[in-house]
Every structure is written in C-alpha cells, then in structure tokens.
Design a protein with these regions (language model features):
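N-terminal leader segment of winged-helix/HTH proteins
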Residues: 1-28, 75, 126, 134-135
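A structural signal for well-ordered alpha-helices, especially hydrophobic packing surfaces
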Residues: 14, 100, 136-140
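N-terminal helix-turn-helix DNA-binding core of bacterial DNA-binding proteins
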Residues: 19-61
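Charged, amphipathic alpha-helical coiled-coil/dimerization segments
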Residues: 69-130
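Exposed, interaction-prone assembly regions rather than primary DNA-binding/catalytic cores
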Residues: 122-146
Length: 146
C-alpha cells in the first residue's frame, strides 16, 4: 500500500538522522529530547508545560522531567503567571539562548549537507513540509480526541 510506504519512508529516516545529530548535541552536553523542548521554548516563548506537551505530543511527566534538567543547567527560567499562580511560563535564559543559536547552526549545517547530497528541489522540500504539517495537525487532533 502506498500509504504504508509513505509513513514508513519517514520512519526510516528518523534513526539515521538521530545518529548524525547526536554528536552535535553531545558536543554541547544536551540530549535530543532536551534539544526538542529547548527549541520549542525558543520558538514559542513564553510558553507553558501544557503547551509544550501538546505541541510535542509528549506526556506531561516526561516534559516535566526534561524541563527540570534544562532548569538545573540554567538553560530556561520559570516565572509564575500573575493571573493564575498554577501556571508557569518558560523562557530561555541568556545561556539557553546562546546554546540554542549554536546548536541551530550546527544542525543546519548537517541538514544542508544531507540535502546537498540529494537532488531534492526547493519546491519538493516545500511540498513535503506542507504535507507533513497537514499530517501532523491531523495526528495531534486524533491523539487529543482519545
């Protein structure tokens, strides 16, 4: 089935991509899960634990554990909401922002090197991105309807 091959094609690139990205993250003493959450905070700050767990489709306890490590490493700060004391806003510290910028550059170099070895056009990449965003939105809706 074409749909099965479609999904499998994305799953098969995930592990090899992680293997290439891990040395970059190890160089900066950060794990892949921490990087994904740090990147999420950088893109959506100020944000909350609930928003991160929704966008990343991860359980709140998993996100909480990862956030604790990022806080302990002085990469993010937590501020209480003035309206709701239970709500806490997460932002990058200057150290976290610096790490985000450095890792982004290193990861972009890796990604550009991989793309350069293919014959993928900018239009093909954009179309793939659009399709993946559509699928991601549907999957998130399905996951939150359970």
């Amino acid at each position: 089935m074409l749909s099965q091959e479609f999904f499998n094609s994305f799953i098969t690139i995930y592990r090899p991509y992680l293997k290439l990205a891990e040395p970059i993250l190890e160089k900066h003493n950060i794990y892949y899960g921490q990087w994904l959450i740090l990147r999420d905070i950088a893109e959506y700050q100020p944000t909350t634990l609930i928003e991160i767990s929704h966008r990343r489709a991860i359980e709140k306890p998993t996100a909480r554990k990862t956030l604790k490590a990022l806080i302990e490493n002085d990469l993010i700060t937590v501020e209480n909401s003035l309206e709701d004391k239970r709500q806490k806003f997460l932002t990058l510290t200057p150290k976290g922002h610096e790490l985000y910028e450095i890792v982004c550059l290193d990861v972009q170099k890796l990604q550009q090197a991989v793309v350069a070895k293919t014959n993928i056009s900018q239009d093909q990449m954009q179309e793939t991105i659009n399709v993946m965003k559509q699928i991601h939105e549907i999957l998130l809706k399905e996951a939150h309807n359970d």
